[in-house]
């Protein structure tokens, strides 16, 4: 089975959300119908080139994301003082800016997830199959490991002495504080993803899909401003895993579970909130 262009909609699944756009959608909004949910398993995807192309796009995007952001974090730590570097604001801009750019580049190929927590949230909302979700997460983690690995390969000594961008709970904060920061931070991100890519909003306003990367990147920026002092900001299990594996010091693994459990809980809460409260999908008429 050959890959088709309709595979590359948001979520990159076999169930595109085709709706009228612009002002023509205003009068037909009452006729809007929810797109069918993606199946739990879609074996046919495994024979489609677009499936593997999407996975490669996720790998490359996460690779570039880790490469740029880890270098930025190292640059800040290497400076003699905060005034001599871009500081926390610069780190936040690097993370948010890279997400903005990479989502823009890959949205038409894979949906531009670049984050297992985002993929998990979209899977819970039935925007993509389990087959695709697992494949994306594997490719994202591999991309993150390679991205951090290239940084270490280019600068081995600074990488080890400057922490390698690994996430840990900062001194003075409890594990509960770190977990809470990761849950709420990921909730903000995934809720923004749902809102920015909502099919019904896209039907009413033609500019929504084009602008989607902007609020997503801005959400990442704001979450980093708030939580860098607490956990270094994970909200992306692949980002945390890649840095931890390549840095590979004991303290980088002590709290590593927080950077998986927190983002997955936050993503699940965002998916439930958007689907049940905002969209009220379970309460809509079946007729």
Curated annotation (Swiss-Prot):
Keywords: Acetylation, Cell membrane, Membrane, Phosphoprotein, Repeat, Transmembrane, Transmembrane helix, Transport. The keyword Membrane applies. Its main location: membrane. InterPro entries: Aquaporin-like (IPR023271), Aquaporin_transptr (IPR034294), MIP (IPR000425), MIP_CS (IPR022357). The modification Phosphoserine is found at residue 285. It is a multi-pass membrane protein. The keyword Transmembrane applies. Pfam families: MIP. A motif (NPA 1) lies at residues 115-117. Residues 1-36 are annotated as: Disordered. A motif (NPA 2) lies at residues 236-238. The modification N-acetylmethionine is found at residue 1. Disulfide bonds: none annotated. GO terms for cellular component: cytosol; plasma membrane. GO terms for biological process: response to water deprivation; water transport. Predominantly expressed in roots and green siliques. Also expressed above ground and in flower buds. Residues 77-92, 155-175, 231-257 are extracellular. Signal peptide: none annotated. The chain crosses the membrane at residues 56-76, 93-113, 134-154, 176-196, 210-230, 258-278. One of its GO terms (molecular function) is water channel activity. Residues 1-55, 114-133, 197-209, 279-287 are cytoplasmic. Aquaporins contain two tandem repeats each containing three membrane-spanning domains and a pore-forming loop with the signature motif Asn-Pro-Ala (NPA). Belongs to the MIP/aquaporin (TC 1.A.8) family. PIP (TC 1.A.8.11) subfamily. Aquaporins facilitate the transport of water and small neutral solutes across cell membranes. This is Probable aquaporin PIP1-4. It comes from Arabidopsis thaliana (Mouse-ear cress).
């Amino acid at each position: 089975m050959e890959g088709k262009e309709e595979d590359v909609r948001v979520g990159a699944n076999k169930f595109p959300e085709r709706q009228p756009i612009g002002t023509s959608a205003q009068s037909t909004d009452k006729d809007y119908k929810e797109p069918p949910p993606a199946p739990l398993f879609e074996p046919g995807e495994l024979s489609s080139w677009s499936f593997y192309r999407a996975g490669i796009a996720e790998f490359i995007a996460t690779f570039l994301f880790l490469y740029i952001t880890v270098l930025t974090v190292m640059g800040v730590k290497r400076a003699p003082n905060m005034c001599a570097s871009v500081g926390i604001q610069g780190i936040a801009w690097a993370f948010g800016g890279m997400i903005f750019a990479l989502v823009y580049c890959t949205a038409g190929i894979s949906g531009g997830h670049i984050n297992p927590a985002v993929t998990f949230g979209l899977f819970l909302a039935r925007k993509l199959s389990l087959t695709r979700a697992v494949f994306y997460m594997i490719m994202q983690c591999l991309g993150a490991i390679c991205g951090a690995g290239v940084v270490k390969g280019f600068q081995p000594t600074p990488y080890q002495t400057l922490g390698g961008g690994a996430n840990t709970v900062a001194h003075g904060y409890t594990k509960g504080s770190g977990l809470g920061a990761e849950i709420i931070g990921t909730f903000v991100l995934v809720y923004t993803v749902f809102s920015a890519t909502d099919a019904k909003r896209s039907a009413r306003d033609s500019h929504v899909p084009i602008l989607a990367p902007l609020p997503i990147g801005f959400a990442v920026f704001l979450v980093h401003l708030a939580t860098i002092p607490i956990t270094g900001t994970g909200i992306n299990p692949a980002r945390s895993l890649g840095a931890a594996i390549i840095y590979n010091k004991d303290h980088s693994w002590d709290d590593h579970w927080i950077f998986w459990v927190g983002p997955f809980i936050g993503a699940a809460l965002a998916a439930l909130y958007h689907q049940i409260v905002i969209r009220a999908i379970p309460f809509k008429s079946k007729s």
